[in-house]
Amino acid sequence: MRSNNNNPLTRDEILSRYFPQYRPAVAASQGLSGGSCIIAHDTHRVVLRRHHDPDAPPAHFLRHYRALSQLPASLAPRALFYTPGWMAVEYLHGVVNSALPDADELAALLYHLHQQPRFGWRIALSPLLAQYWSCCDPARRTPFWLRRLKQLQKNGEPRPLRLAPLHMDVHGDNIVLTSAGLRLIDWEYAGDGDIALELAAVWVEDERQHRQLADAYAARARIDARQLWRQIRLWHPWVIMLKAGWFEYRWRQTGEQQFIRLADETWRQLRMKG
């Protein structure tokens, strides 16, 4: 049975209707947010995810489920169940480390993803940046932010080097080291786009780590390393604005202080770079 989007089922209703033998096991964990939880029956665990963004259309949540349905088990957890507002996915047993894997391992994982068939929907950053501007706290809108936004919109997004399915939220907490190797979780922002955009968006510690990843990927993908790095740098202003806007967006939604601190730090980085 599919619930009404205007009156979504509660977690307890989902459990009683679709998972009567399961009980909540862990309230929150790495890669989980917005009311998601782990449910368990004996030793079997499932991740129950909730559509937690009130400003995102239900179609975006459905895309998340469809992305997981398309991906092989060598990359992502299996999609198990969907009803409007909720999905259930396989729980991956393994180790989550806040630090990224080494460059060669991560490059291999991303290259494997980028070799898969495309999802069927493109990632478009310009309208997303505009949405973050319009949905943020009006008191946080600054002339600097507006100038940067208009400049990016005027320039347009870089021409893709190679189009592929992207994860678009690659950081240590979204990578699980399982007994079968590395897997990516939390595919909320997945879509088709430039491989260099994916690499530009990885949450690296510094430029040295970024260059190591780019060089390792270029070697595996047989791309000229200098050409790939130039393309990554073209995407860099877009990615920094994307992160700043997302922090502002989440601050407006949640009021959590961590987001305003991260937003302030990202704006400082942007101002320092002109």
UniProtKB/Swiss-Prot annotation:
One of its GO terms (molecular function) is thiamine kinase activity. It catalyses: thiamine + ATP = thiamine phosphate + ADP + H(+). Keywords: ATP-binding, Kinase, Nucleotide-binding, Transferase. Belongs to the thiamine kinase family. NCBIfam families: PRK10271.1, ycfN_thiK. Catalyzes the ATP-dependent phosphorylation of thiamine to thiamine phosphate. Is involved in thiamine salvage. This is Thiamine kinase. The lineage of its organism: Bacteria, Pseudomonadati, Pseudomonadota, Gammaproteobacteria, Enterobacterales.
